[in-house]
Swiss-Prot record:
Its EC number is 1.1.1.403. PROSITE patterns: ADH_SHORT. InterPro entries: NAD(P)-bd_dom_sf, Sc_DH/Rdtase_CS, SDR_fam. Pfam families: adh_short_C2. This is D-threitol dehydrogenase. It comes from Mycolicibacterium smegmatis (strain ATCC 700084 / mc(2)155).
Length: 260
């Protein structure tokens, strides 16, 4: 496209004809993003360690027979990641969108955190994101385009008490994503991150109900936590062609927590 040409932007952020691979899709933010993508016309490859949960989510999305499928994957295992990416490509013929939403949080004071918890957090959150980006990114580069959305966190911007492994992993996700954006942007593959505050998924409710959550909300200018669909809305935009000029960005959705 030359500078003289006008860019036509779809303000409905439609994803018709696109195939989206979403990890961590069986529940929480991943499920919300998968559902939002489906409403925008995408076919969904719901990928999760919980194979039954992924298949159940795919079934709930409706649509034409075979429009959505569930796949099992351990994102911390390179062979499992490659097998899942290959299976999705074989089933749908292409992968246009990748969302890395699978993740864990092992919390403890830094001096008490076990090496096992450190290693598992980095393996799932950071290595898992890289491995899936690498496996799917190769296909996107061969196809000449794609959009990747990696879930980071406000913990990728500021230090959070008892979050040493989680912060390390999410700072890493942002770093990896920026490097991929720099390397792949010129070849048609955009890579961005979303960094939410506490999100009121089922796990979020359990972890942050009560006085602890009330205290944290007082530090957020908007005075509340985020809802899964608010994160999904951002993921829809970043995956859509309307975001064609957005590459290497970190979209912070934290009600202003990190500006203070």
């Amino acid at each position: 496209m030359t500078q003289a040409q006008e860019l036509s932007v779809d303000f409905d952020f439609r994803l018709d004809g696109k195939v989206a691979l979403v990890t961590g899709a069986a529940s929480g933010i991943g499920a919300a993003i998968a559902s939002a993508y489906a409403t925008k016309g995408a076919r969904i490859a719901a990928v999760d360690l919980n194979a039954e949960g992924a298949e159940a989510l795919a079934a709930q999305l409706g649509g034409d027979r075979g429009a959505h499928r569930g796949f099992a994957c351990d994102v911390a295992d390179a062979a499992s990641v490659q097998a899942a990416a290959d299976a999705v490509a074989a089933e749908f013929g292409r992968i246009d969108i990748l969302v890395n939403s699978a993740g864990v949080a092992r919390l403890a004071p830094a001096e008490e955190l076990s090496l096992q918890d450190w290693d598992s957090t980095l393996a799932i959150n950071l290595s898992g994101t890289f491995l899936m980006c690498q496996a799917v990114g190769k296909r996107m580069l061969e196809a000449g385009g794609g959009a990747i959305v990696n879930m980071a966190s406000q913990a990728a911007t500021v230090a959070l008490d008892q979050h040493v492994a989680y912060c390390a992993s999410k700072f890493g996700v942002v770093g990896v994503s920026k490097v991929l954006a720099a390397e792949w942007g010129g070849r048609g593959v955009r890579v961005n991150t979303i960094s939410p505050t506490v999100v009121l998924t089922e796990l979020g409710h359990k972890a942050w109900d009560g006085p602890r959550g009330d205290a944290l909300k007082k530090l957020i200018p908007t005075g509340r936590f985020a809802y899964p669909d608010e994160i999904a809305a951002a993921a829809v935009f970043l995956a859509s062609d309307a975001a064609a000029m957005i590459n290497g960005a970190d979209l912070v959705i934290d009600g202003g927590y990190t500006i203070k």
